[in-house]
């Protein structure tokens, strides 16, 4: 249960409160000037930590497959860690008016729904592992959150709304992958009582 990939996933979860403290610290760390734009140092530090934590998603999966250490615990914990990290970041982005609340609500609602689906089916002995659309969704969310945490830099220097477009792509894949999880598991869900 506590093999290397699962320990990496647990480390990702442990980084979430540190990320939140950096982002929500009640003091001003100053701003970093980039051309005509600027970004709060706390947001830059938070973005770097978020990107590091997000990268562990790839690392734990790589080692799980390479070392043949894929476990049901890991199949459950890995997507949960992703959801916790991304949800914490999205809520903070809303607080700083860097993301529209309705988009964050759509993303987090889907995450709760799919987690609920996984929990119900786990009670019947079925494990709902991440599929390709779910993985694309996760990376789309990570890219969007990273770009938003960075205040759209460096794209802001050329007035290209990369962060906004990335968030729209993330919402799209969030909804589509959620639909796929439920449609593929609907029969199992109906017979789970």
Curated annotation (Swiss-Prot):
Keywords: Cell membrane, Lipid biosynthesis, Lipid metabolism, Membrane, Phospholipid biosynthesis, Phospholipid metabolism, Transferase, Transmembrane, Transmembrane helix
Catalytic activity field: a CDP-1,2-diacyl-sn-glycerol + sn-glycerol 3-phosphate = a 1,2-diacyl-sn-glycero-3-phospho-(1'-sn-glycero-3'-phosphate) + CMP + H(+)
Principal subcellular localisation of the protein: membrane
Biological processes, Gene Ontology terms: glycerophospholipid biosynthetic process; phosphatidylglycerol biosynthetic process
Subcellular location: Cell membrane
InterPro entries: CDP-alcohol_PTase-I, CDP-OH_P_trans, CDP-OH_PTrfase_TM_dom, CDP_ALCOHOL_P_TRANSF_CS, Phosphatidylglycerol_P_synth
UniProt keyword Metal-binding present: no
EC number(s) recorded for this UniProt protein: 2.7.8.5
Membrane topology: Multi-pass membrane protein
UniProt GO molecular function: CDP-diacylglycerol-glycerol-3-phosphate 3-phosphatidyltransferase activity
Pathway of action: Phospholipid metabolism; phosphatidylglycerol biosynthesis; phosphatidylglycerol from CDP-diacylglycerol: step 1/2
GO CC terms, sorted: plasma membrane
Residues spanning the membrane: 8-28, 39-59, 88-108, 157-177
Function: This protein catalyzes the committed step to the synthesis of the acidic phospholipids.
Similarity section: Belongs to the CDP-alcohol phosphatidyltransferase class-I family.
Protein name in the entry: CDP-diacylglycerol--glycerol-3-phosphate 3-phosphatidyltransferase
């Amino acid at each position: 249960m506590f093999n290397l990939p699962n320990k990496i996933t647990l480390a990702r979860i442990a980084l979430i409160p540190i990320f939140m403290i950096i982002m929500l610290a009640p003091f001003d760390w100053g701003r970093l000037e980039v051309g005509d734009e600027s970004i709060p140092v706390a947001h830059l530090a938070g973005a770097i930590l978020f990107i590091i934590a997000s990268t562990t998603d790839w690392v734990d999966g790589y080692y799980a497959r390479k070392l043949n250490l894929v476990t049901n615990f890991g199949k459950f914990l890995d997507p949960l860690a992703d959801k916790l990290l991304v949800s914490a970041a999205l809520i903070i982005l809303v607080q700083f008016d860097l993301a529209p609340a309705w988009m964050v609500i759509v993303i987090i609602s889907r995450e709760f729904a799919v987690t609920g689906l996984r929990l119900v089916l786990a009670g019947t002995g079925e494990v709902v592992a991440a599929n390709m659309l779910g993985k694309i969704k996760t990376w789309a969310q990570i890219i969007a959150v990273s770009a938003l945490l960075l205040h759209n830099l460096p794209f802001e220097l050329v007035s290209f709304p990369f962060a906004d477009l990335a968030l729209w792509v993330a919402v799209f894949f969030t909804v589509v992958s959620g639909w796929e999880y439920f449609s593929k598991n609907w029969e199992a869900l109906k017979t789970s009582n």
